[in-house]
């Protein structure tokens, strides 16, 4: 099996801001695995919050390149088990795991959702994310991209007022992501007003380790709350089940599709709502997420829509949020360059 690694710098259409950072460009690593004339692609973006760069991931993977290329590939699951034994970050494992799943599906000539025993005739609509900005800029972004569901990034001193103003310009469903910027008291106080303004749920309002605060929120908040920063890996699901109404799985954080599939199963057994979210990433990562759609309650896979230019082809998202799946097997990904 041959491996290729390449860093890309993705340019965004607009500056993207959340409660803790802003950026106009996003570095990402694209990994390729080639076997028997087929190449599978995977992606993992850099992430300053977790101190991950494209360069650090490349260095990690290059350290075991010979072992990867001599690995007897049979299934993505066995390959993931092999990777877990190495000293790799979950981000690096994710890039390789996504490539392995894409390769596996291409070798079989089947899309991943079919291999997993699901079909793609019903799936949740992705939200479109509006980052923190001046109010007129946020309104302009909504008008530029009419969409049935918006995720609104918050974490300012006037969050409820922002939603009240945005509501004047659309009838779309709102989802709120405060990225750990609120206290339990703020969350409980804001929720009734936000519910009246058409907010569906709140995503990670509190700091990731504020379990006592989340216990208060669980008992007193009138809106469902979805874990993001509190739910990183498989072992987090059980604790989140006692403090949240659902979880948002990020493939880069948990280590790819292989653990994500297990997390989905575990969360559903616990009665939790399941969402998969994206980074600002290309269609390589988005197409992998899309394979999970039939198993999800919610999805946030607008990352490639936020880019000035995508580096890959795969799943396409229509102007109404509909998804067009590629005819290729696996995730169906090809690179543009």
Swiss-Prot record:
The keyword Isomerase applies. It is an enzyme of class 5 (isomerase). Binds 1 Mg(2+) ion per subunit. Keywords: Isomerase, Magnesium, Metal-binding. Its cofactor is Mg(2+). It holds the Pfam family MR_MLE_C. GO terms for molecular function: magnesium ion binding; racemase and epimerase activity; racemase and epimerase activity, acting on amino acids and derivatives. Gene3D superfamilies: Enolase-like C-terminal domain, Enolase-like, N-terminal domain. InterPro entries: DgoD-like, Dipeptide_epimerase, Enolase-like_C_sf, Enolase-like_N, Enolase_C-like, Mandelate_racemase_C. Substrate binds at residues 129, 151-153, 250, 300-302. Its EC number is 5.1.1.-. Mg(2+) binds at residues 177, 203, 228. Belongs to the mandelate racemase/muconate lactonizing enzyme family. Broad specificity dipeptide epimerase. Catalyzes the epimerization of L-Ala-L-Ala, L-Ala-L-Glu, L-Ala-L-Ser, L-Ala-L-Thr and L-Ala-L-Met (in vitro). Part of a large, functionally divergent protein family. Protein modeling and substrate docking were used to predict the substrate specificity, prior to biochemical analysis. This is L-Ala-D/L-amino acid epimerase. The lineage of its organism: Bacteria, Pseudomonadati, Bacteroidota, Flavobacteriia, Flavobacteriales.
